[in-house]
Curated annotation (Swiss-Prot):
Any one of the GO BP annotations: DNA replication
Record-given protein name: LexA repressor
InterPro entries per UniProt: LexA, LexA-like, LexA/Signal_pep-like_sf, LexA_DNA-bd_dom, LexA_repressor, Peptidase_S24_LexA, Peptidase_S24_S26A/B/C, WH-like_DNA-bd_sf
Source organism: Paracidovorax citrulli (strain AAC00-1)
Gene: lexA
Role of this protein: Represses a number of genes involved in the response to DNA damage (SOS response), including recA and lexA. In the presence of single-stranded DNA, RecA interacts with LexA causing an autocatalytic cleavage which disrupts the DNA-binding part of LexA, leading to derepression of the SOS regulon and eventually DNA repair.
A single GO molecular function term of this UniProt record: serine-type endopeptidase activity
Segments of the chain annotated as binding DNA: 31-51
Lineage summary: Bacteria, Pseudomonadati, Pseudomonadota, Betaproteobacteria, Burkholderiales
Record-listed E.C. numbers: 3.4.21.88
Length: 224
């Protein structure tokens, strides 16, 4: 195992916040959210701590997105082991879930149909606050600003219900998409988290179903 990076108390607190946010919401916090959590006067103070964590090899900062923070698995596991804690990163052999990875979904067939399962992953159960039923490989960058990148594995709990503002897996016509749900008095909208992509409005009479709720996110590189 790698030597554990030496963190200051504040750096450790920020790392814990990042891990908790990813486990609970599927996305890392923004600089503004970190600043608010710790009472910093500006997001710049949060950025300085993130830069320090990046220099120590604990995280990777992704430019162009407010949630562009990626955990570096080996370094974080080393820190958690040194602290005697087992946090939210998958560690083989501990409380494992066997989750099917869903590839492309054929029109009109159930997401969990056998022909859609590319492979099965063993994933640590404590990574998730709510137990997922499957992993869905993210295609494209429409949810970039929520920290969901192309190639990531979205952990999904099968459900037909979701609250306003939650990130869902939706079936719209023959397409399956990951978007943020917004219900208004007269419409259902599927919101991207990237200004380069349009808002999708569900038209009256159009086939629409909620297939699942995002309950976590795994960087594809963590499972290689």
């Amino acid at each position: 195992m790698l030597d554990s990076p030496k963190l200051t108390a504040r750096q450790q607190q920020i790392l814990d916040l990042i891990q908790t946010a990813i486990a609970r919401t599927g996305a890392p916090p923004t600089r503004a959210e970190i600043a608010a959590e710790f009472g910093f006067k500006s997001a710049n103070a949060a950025e300085e701590h993130l830069q320090a964590l990046a220099r120590k090899g604990v995280i990777e900062l992704v430019s162009g997105t407010s949630r562009g923070i990626r955990l570096r698995g080996e370094a974080v596991r080393s820190i958690n082991a040194a602290r005697g804690t087992q946090f939210h990163l998958p560690i083989p052999g501990i409380s494992q879930l066997m989750l099917p990875l869903i590839g492309r979904v054929a029109a009109g067939s159930p997401i969990l149909a056998e022909e859609h399962v590319d492979q099965t992953y063993s994933v640590e159960g404590s990574l998730f606050q709510h137990k997922p039923d499957y992993l869905l490989k993210v295609r494209g960058m429409s949810m970039r600003d929520a920290g969901i990148m192309d190639g990531d594995l979205l952990a999904v709990q099968s459900t037909r219900e979701a609250r306003n503002g939650q990130i869902i897996v939706a079936r719209l016509g023959d397409e399956v998409t990951v978007k943020r749900l917004r219900r208004t008095a007269g419409a259902i909208e599927l919101l991207p988290e990237n200004p380069d992509y349009p808002i999708i409005t569900v038209q009256p009479g159009e086939s629409f179903e909620i297939e699942g709720l995002a309950v976590g996110l795994i960087r594809n590189t963590m499972l290689m």
